[in-house]
C-alpha cells in the first residue's frame, strides 16, 4: 500500500478509510457508497475527521446520521416530509424538497445556497475569481488563457512564449 493514500474519514495519509481507527462504518463500499454494501454518501470533513452535521439520513430526511444508524422506526417521505410512507406512495402534489437546504420548491441542482467540498460557504469561481458562484455558472463569457493569463483566447491559441506547451 502506498503511503500517499489518504483516508476519507480522517483526511490523514498512510491508510484507507476501511482501515481508519476513527471507526464509524464505511464498510467495504467506502465513502460515497457503491460496491460491496457501501457506507453511504459522506462528503467533506470539518478538519478533524467526519462531518456529522452534514450526514443526511435518507430514511428520516434529517442531518446527523445515515439511514443505517437511523433512530426512527417509520420512513419519511422525501416529497412531503411526512412519516409513514415513501415518496412513490405520496399523495401530495409534486413540490420537491431540496436535500441541501431542506426548503421546498426546488431540487438540489437548482439550490441557491452555494456549497463547496467543505459545506455551505461562499464559493469562488476560478474563471473570474469572484465569490458567490462556481465556474460552470460564471456570467463571464470571455475566455482566459491559462498560459499567459490574458483574456480573449485559450492556451491552445496562445502566441506568447511559454503560453502554449
Curated annotation (Swiss-Prot):
Keyword terms, alphabetized: Cytoplasm, Endoplasmic reticulum, Metal-binding, Nucleus, Phosphoprotein, Repeat, Zinc, Zinc-finger
GO MF term set: mRNA binding; single-stranded RNA binding; translation regulator activity; zinc ion binding
PROSITE patterns, per database record: ZF_CCHC (PS50158)
Name the record gives this protein: CCHC-type zinc finger nucleic acid binding protein
Gene3D superfamilies: Zinc finger, CCHC-type
Coarse class of the protein's main subcellular location: nucleus
Domain of life of the source: Eukaryota
Organism: Drosophila melanogaster
Consequences of knocking out this gene: RNAi-mediated knockdown results in lethality before the pupal stage. RNAi-mediated knockdown in the wing imaginal disks results in reduction of wing size associated with loss of patterning elements such as veins; this phenotype is reversed by Myc overexpression.
Gene: CNBP
Amino acid at each position: 500500500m502506498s503511503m500517499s493514500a489518504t483516508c476519507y474519514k480522517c483526511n490523514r495519509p498512510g491508510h484507507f478509510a476501511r482501515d481508519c481507527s476513527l471507526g464509524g462504518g464505511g464498510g467495504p463500499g467506502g465513502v460515497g457508497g457503491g460496491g460491496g454494501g457501501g457506507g453511504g454518501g459522506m462528503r467533506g470533513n470539518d478538519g478533524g475527521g467526519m462531518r456529522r452535521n452534514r450526514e443526511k439520513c435518507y430514511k428520516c430526511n434529517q442531518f446527523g446520521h445515515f439511514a443505517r444508524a437511523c433512530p426512527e422506526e417509520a420512513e419519511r417521505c422525501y416529497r412531503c416530509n411526512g412519516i409513514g410512507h415513501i415518496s412513490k406512495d405520496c399523495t401530495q402534489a409534486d413540490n420537491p424538497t431540496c436535500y441541501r437546504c431542506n426548503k421546498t420548491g426546488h431540487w438540489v441542482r437548482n439550490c441557491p445556497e452555494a456549497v463547496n467540498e467543505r459545506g455551505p460557504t461562499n464559493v469562488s469561481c476560478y474563471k473570474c475569481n469572484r465569490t458567490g458562484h462556481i465556474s460552470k455558472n460564471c456570467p463571464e463569457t470571455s475566455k482566459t488563457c491559462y498560459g499567459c493569463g490574458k483574456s480573449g483566447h485559450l492556451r491552445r491559441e496562445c502566441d506568447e512564449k511559454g503560453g502554449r506547451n
